Structures are given as C-alpha cells and as structure tokens.
Amino acid sequence: KKNRGINDYKENTAYRYDAANALGDIEISDTWKNFIKYHTSYEFTSELYDIFLESIKQIYKVDKDKLPNKNNTGVRFKDNAFFNTDCQFVINTPTSGDTSVIEPHLDNPKEFYAALFYMRDKEDTSTGGSLTTHKFIGEPSFYGKARVREEKVNLIEEIEYKENRLAVFLNSPLSIHGVTKRSKTDFYRKYMNIIGEFNNELFDFRPFLEK
C-alpha cells in the first residue's frame, strides 16, 4: 500500500489524509473525490449554518449574514482562505487490548464545527470506539493540549461507533468529547473527519489550565 506520510506506525493511533492531498491523488476514486468536494464546499457549510443557526446565535452571538460566505471559504492547506474546510480520511489502527484513542478533550480553538462520518466494517465485532460527550462537574479545567481529566467531567451521552452514522457538533469552550476504550481487534476504526475552521482562535481555554 502507498505510504501517505506514515513513517511510524503505532497501535490504536489516528492517521489522517486531508482533502488537499486526497483531491490530487490519482489513487483516490472519483466517487470519493466528489464526496470530499461536496463536504468541503460552501454549500455544505451553509447547510450546517441553517441546522445550527439558533445554537450559533446563542454561543457566538452572530446571525448567518455575519458568518463566512462563498467568497471567503476555501479548502484547508490549499486555499488559505478566511474560513477553511477539510474532509479527512481517518483510521485508528488495530489494538491488542483495552485502550483509548483519546480521552475527553477540546478540539482546536480555530475549529467552528466538526462532523464525524463513521464507516465501521460489517465484520467488526469489537466493542468501544464510541464518541462520548461530557459536561464539567465544576469549573472548567484542562491540562496539556486541551485534555480533561475523567474525574472533572460527567458523561452526557455515548454515541455508538456504527456504520453510516454521522455525528455533528459545534466547537465551543464546553464541547468536551472523547472516545471509549476499544477492545482487542484486528480491524481499523474508520471515519471521515469533516471540519470548518477560521484562521483565528474562537476561544481561549488556557486560563483554565491546571497550575
């Protein structure tokens, strides 16, 4: 198989292939390229604006006319626009035991939205790998790169890693999420990571880092 920048293969680790590279890759089918083109387009972003408009108004205090438009939206690592989108192929490698891909955390503060399209193999009978959402028990508290300790949050919901399932959320200072531990498996955890981000940060979690 073609090595797409992966030089150090590790167990239960995420590896990504972004839209800018995939769209120029002759080994990627036209079907997938069309999928990527649509999910990095302003048309898709505009649909998300409409779906989440009330939440956007509540969290960010702006209406749709103040959000990025077709003229200033581009593809990340390709266009360097005011607002950049991406649609990444992502795999989490097989695991030999109960391990977690990532604990509760916040995404990049530049990110405005994220959509996870799960592509679980039909033959994959392993457990875990589900998306979790969380709420702080008290005041926000982070360590490292926007990580959150398990004892600082309560579980809100567990969204099963399932074939053809799409999970979408707005990124905010309270959008804490993680992934449940995966049991031993030879299967990859596969999904498309669809995001939109600004060139600037939307919030700052650093004042809440552990001292």
Where are these regions (language model features)?
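Non-heme Fe(II)-dependent double-stranded beta-helix
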Residues: 1-40
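Catalytic core of non-heme Fe(II) oxygenases with the double-stranded beta-helix
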Residues: 29-37, 45-208
